[in-house]
């Protein structure tokens, strides 16, 4: 059984793929380079970023599950692949913690001000809520009132079954609540 724990800033870091290894290497370089210097710095651990901020003309979307689904809708191609259906999750598909770009911008602003008086901070930037890949697809189906044809692919051996942030430090330091953690708010801009 896969543990349903949330990852906090002090959790043991055990990357399962090269992407995770590169993120950890960058954290180590930043910490090693700056810990004994006068520089103030933050390590922000992004979970799965979605959305865009069209009001500010920053409308380049990040390549994510949400973008893949919205591109399929745009092209009227309602076929989609899911990598794996035998995970120990609510519906067998991988679970992720998604955070909207608007919430990330608010976090960045608060971290910038925090660093004026504090040397360093490491923060999880996630919603603290898990959604499975299938739940995300079903939410889009509900929004567009149309079903997707889903094909399940062989699971990548490096695929993480479930991941979720413990964002309690973020809430404690900044009284920051993630405003777009409900699935319908996450898909609203797509």
Where are these regions (language model features)?
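C-terminal catalytic core of Y-nucleophile DNA break-rejoin enzymes
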Residues: 65-66, 100
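C-terminal substrate-binding subdomain of Rossmann-fold SDR/epimerase-dehydratase oxidoreductases
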Residues: 71-190
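Catalytic helix-loop patch of NAD(P)-dependent Rossmann-fold dehydrogenases
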Residues: 1-50, 54-64
């Amino acid at each position: 059984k896969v543990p349903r724990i949330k990852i906090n800033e002090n959790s043991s870091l055990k990357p399962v793929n090269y992407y995770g290894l590169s993120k950890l290497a960058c954290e180590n370089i930043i910490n090693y380079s700056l810990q004994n210097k006068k520089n103030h710095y933050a390590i922000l651990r992004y979970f799965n970023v979605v959305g865009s901020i069209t009001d500010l003309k920053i409308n380049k979307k990040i390549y994510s599950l949400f973008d893949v689904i919205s591109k399929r809708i745009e092209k009227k191609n309602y076929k989609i692949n899911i990598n794996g259906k035998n995970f120990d999750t609510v519906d067998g598909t991988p679970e992720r913690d998604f955070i909207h770009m608007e919430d990330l911008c608010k976090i960045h602003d608060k971290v910038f001000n925090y660093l004026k008086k504090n040397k360093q901070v490491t923060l999880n930037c996630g919603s603290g809520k898990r959604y499975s890949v299938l739940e995300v697809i079903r939410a889009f189906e509900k929004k567009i009132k149309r079903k997707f044809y889903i094909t399940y692919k062989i699971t990548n051996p490096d695929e993480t079954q479930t991941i979720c942030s413990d964002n309690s430090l973020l809430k404690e330091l900044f009284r920051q609540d993630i405003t777009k953690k409900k699935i319908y708010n996450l898909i609203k801009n797509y």
